[in-house]
């Protein structure tokens, strides 16, 4: 969705396959898309329109959008199956995303003024006579926010970035990860069709982002979620460096859980440890950025921990073995 219209690439595109059945779900390509025009549209159309609103007005739009999307979530759940997600996985992604919109809507009305700017701190007197004073204020950036998202949360990943961006009064261009972009596109399409936010406030690129970063300036920002290598590559872009473009990177993390030597088998702490690690190994097939990827267990407890893990994981395997291609749990 670029510069106020839906765009279909002239190229054949790359097929996106159902993770369970291997059937083609969609094709993806951004070939021929004028990325400079998208950035210009955000600056000249989306930015002025959303900056006209106060923080409270933007917050109310976030709430309206969250309510609207929640009413459509069953169709998003159905499409989410093709990404390889179970219903529980989808709840984290879809309901979690909508919940984020609700959360920022509430924070915007509770914590921010019903104004277009924020007064930052007290007035500072900078002259002996008191006639020379200064006051800091915070206003929206005049550029565009570019959101480059990861594959594991096609809905929540988009909405967790959009919520604070739109609340701040900045237009955004969303670039979802390729393999699950069809789910992002479905939710985004519902957002556009709702006409809740003004035109130009949000745009979408499915496929390569091409030279988009080359069209950014010092009033723009990039929020990236993905691998550290890709993040370093993007951050070293000549335009990003020369124009001092704000760049926020959420990359590889290694979370661990440690079992204390006093948490004996049968204790509440032992059961909690095993339960949480097993949950993190299976939720989103262990691909959450916050997943526990390493455990530290006292040597004399390893056998007990492995036995309990095997029991929990074995139960999951037996339940899933007889499911249809699309799991529902």
Describe the residue ranges of each PLM region:
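A structured beta-alpha segment of the ubiquitous adenosine-cofactor-binding alpha/beta core
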Residues: 134-135, 202-223
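Beta-loop-alpha module in the N-terminal Rossmann-like domain of NAD(P)-dependent dehydrogenases
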Residues: 145, 152, 206-213, 226-233
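Residue-level signal for inorganic ion chemistry
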Residues: 22, 58, 169, 202, ...
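Hydrophobic residues in well-ordered beta-strands that form the structural core
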Residues: 174-175, 206, 249-251
């Amino acid at each position: 969705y670029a510069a106020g219209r839906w765009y279909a690439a002239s190229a054949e595109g790359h097929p996106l396959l159902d993770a369970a059945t291997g059937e083609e779900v969609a094709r993806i390509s951004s070939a021929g898309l004028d990325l400079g025009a998208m950035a210009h549209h955000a600056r000249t159309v989306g930015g002025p329109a959303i900056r006209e609103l106060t923080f409270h007005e933007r917050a109310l739009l976030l709430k309206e959008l969250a309510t609207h999307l929640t009413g459509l979530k069953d169709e998003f759940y159905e499409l989410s199956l093709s990404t390889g997600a179970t219903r529980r996985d989808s709840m984290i992604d879809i309901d979690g995303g909508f919940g984020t919109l609700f959360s920022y809507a509430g924070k915007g009305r509770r914590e921010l003024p019903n104004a277009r700017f924020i007064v930052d701190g007290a007035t500072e007197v900078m002259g002996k006579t008191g006639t020379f004073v200064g006051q800091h204020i915070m206003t929206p950036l005049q550029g565009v926010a570019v959101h480059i998202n990861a594959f594991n949360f096609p809905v929540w990943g988009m909405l967790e970035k959009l919520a604070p961006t739109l609340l701040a009064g900045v237009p955004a261009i969303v670039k979802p990860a390729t393999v699950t972009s069809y789910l992002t596109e479905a939710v985004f399409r519902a957002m556009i069709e709702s006409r809740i936010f003004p035109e130009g406030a949000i745009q979408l690129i499915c496929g390569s982002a091409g030279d988009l970063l080359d069209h950014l300036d010092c009033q723009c920002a990039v929020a990236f979620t993905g691998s550290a290598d890709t993040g370093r590559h993007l951050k070293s872009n000549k335009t990003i460096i020369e124009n001092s473009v704000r760049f926020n990177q959420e990359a590889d993390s290694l979370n661990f859980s440690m079992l204390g030597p006093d948490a004996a088998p049968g204790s509440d702490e032992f059961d909690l440890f095993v339960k949480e690690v097993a949950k993190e190994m299976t939720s989103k097939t262990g691909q959450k950025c916050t997943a526990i990827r390493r455990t530290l267990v006292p040597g004399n407890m390893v056998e007990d921990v492995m036995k309990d893990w095997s029991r929990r994981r074995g139960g999951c395997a037996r339940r899933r073995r007889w499911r249809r291609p699309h799991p529902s749990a």
